Amino acid sequence: MFPESVPEGQRFRLTEEDRRFLYRYMSMLPRESVEPAYPDREAYPDSYVKLLLFGDSGDPITGHVRLFNKVGQAYGYLIDNAYVVDFEAGVEFLLTAVLQVNQNRIYNDDQYEYDEVGLPFMARLGRAVYRFELQRERARRPDLSRFRVHD
């Protein structure tokens, strides 16, 4: 996300086009995908892969908030690793959460509390940090222009 934070000799050799490609696909919502296409918005709502802030909602995500993230779900674990930006408010933050929702402690039994516990917790955690960041004093407004990769 921030190649300038790594010494030049240790960076991945990505072109500007490569970087924009990664930013675009890391922040893409299911409805924005062409290949593969996800036309069923009920089965694949915007929140399908955006657990922090939105995991408990089937509502569309507005264009001014973007999560550049990677999620995972397996064996009673949920993970979301996200760089969150709000283009209108000039807010940015990094947040990673790993949550175990396996009340019976039996793995591979498909008895996990993703919907009841995990997704609501992830969404509330993300919203709590987002609200904090909206109020936090900053010395300067971040330049988020390089992350505007969607029309």
Model-derived features: where do they sit?
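Structured C-terminal helix/loop/strand segments within mature extracytoplasmic catalytic/sensor domains
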Residues: M1-D151
